[in-house]
From Swiss-Prot:
Residue span(s) of domain Rho-GAP: 226-426
Residue segments, region Disordered: 493-547
Domain of life where this protein originates: Eukaryota
Family annotation (InterPro entries): ARHGAP6_RhoGAP (IPR041852), Rho_GTPase_activation_prot (IPR008936), RHOGAP6/36 (IPR037863), RhoGAP_dom (IPR000198)
Basic and acidic residues bias (residue ranges): 524-538
Pfam families: RhoGAP (PF00620)
UniProt keyword list: GTPase activation, Signal
Organism this protein belongs to: Ailuropoda melanoleuca (Giant panda)
Swiss-Prot/TrEMBL GO biological process terms: signal transduction
Ranges that cross the membrane: none
Protein name per the record: Rho GTPase-activating protein 36
Molecular-function annotations in GO: GTPase activator activity
Signal peptide (UniProt feature, chain positions): 1-40
Amino acid sequence: MGGCNPFLKAARTLCPRIMPPLLFLSAFIFLVNVLGGAPGHNPDRRTKMISIHSLSELERLKLQETAYHELVARHFLSEFKPDRALPIDRPNTFEKWFLILRGQQRAVSLKTFGIRLEEVLVNELTRRKHLELTAAMQIEESTGQASGRRRGNVVQRLFGRIRRFFSSRRDEPSLPREFTRRGRRGAVSVDSLAELEDGALLLQTLQLSKISFPIGQRLLGSKRKMSLNPIAKQIPQVVEACCSFIEKHGLSAVGIFTLEYSEERVRELREEFDQGLDVVLDDTQNVHDVAALLKEFFRDMKDSLLPDDLYMSFLLTATLKPQDQLSALQLLVYLMPPCHSDTLERLLKALHKITENCEDSIGIDGQLVSGNRMTSTNLALVFGSALLKKGRFAKRESRKTRLGIDHYVASVNVVRAMIDNWDILFQVPPHIQKQVAKRVWKSSPEALDFIRRRNLRKIQSARIKMEEDALLSDPVENSAEAWAAVLAQSKPFDEGSSEEPAVPPGTAHSHDDEEGAGNPPIPEQDRPLLRVPREKQAKTGIGYFFP
């Protein structure tokens, strides 16, 4: 017994030293397992995600830079080059000369099917502007203002067309003079689109009146000035019309995209869209005809909706675990040109709604409602080869990168994952928001200051509107949830986190801190709320301006 006394004394001596670390460790394990994380950690990340459409051009550029570096670190970009422009077909010079002399260039180039996606959007903008000019000329002729206008002779018009042909760039779609900055005679200047009642409509109108950024190109690698306004959605008219019709009339159609359709009716609809007519898809149309028209649009596109230089990168995600695949798909979507990502989002949204009605259900009246039998796997089998096409860059890349599975099987797996998670692909998670904020701060602190002030005013306007609605009508039942939704859609990045970039004292701070959550601080009175900073030349050679 006497030999055990030294051990007992040693245990009694070490107990006071060991117990505090053990208690701390047990408390930490309790927080992780029961509360969902350490103090200050929010386990529900989806409530803090924001849409990429709420980001400005500058933030979208920094988002693409962040996605590029993340994918390079994961070895997902073998042949991708950020400064490489998307391929554009070279026009036939002799044929173009002949059409210009006859004045038929505009009539034959404004198509919808069988061309690249950016060309479809440019043709729609050109047609819309041409209709506006035609209507204005008709008004002038009806009022007699154009009766005395002198017309140039045939020789002058011929030399004018030849001069415009040689002076225009051949690698870009030709636009009317009214579309260029030189042709605009008026301008609109606003401090913030959030102060307007219909800011989205005004933003779309302003971006239709002038091409601020070449359609079909990435922001990454550009040396132009970046705007601090969001980018208007760029979706072809045929895609929007077909998706809206299917969501309204085709969710319960059994075997949509797979059953037989009328080839004659699809050809008529295709010709109407190619001619630039105002096509209205009403109740008289067949759902399967409209579905076939939408499928033909993506199948006959010269380029791929998922860019050619990212072909193998998308296929490589099929070899990952589901959570890792979703994260990689998010980064790849960020790298896509705005027109491609917007069109992809619209298509995936419609396809996801179809999958929600694939099984039988009980209606409101208690009757059995049959499902459409189109799961995400079935839709991926239909659209897999139409969305992921192997082009020139993809063929060169596939020689160096070999997959363990067939390319068609991988494409089906990728499209299925995108349909199932369409609402997450176009959201920016908090950790990416922090990196975007840091990159904006490094390039232009004044731009970060302006973006935060504008979003602060947006939140204040939303709060005032909610208070007015509460006074005019009954109180909102879920006011806290509604206010949280407003905050989630208004923040350009995760401002509530503790890892914010270092901002000087003169800049605005977060509106959603612990002491004043829901009560934005009042800006200081000794300086204007929205100041216009001077142009700043960043290290990358990119300037920034405030619209």
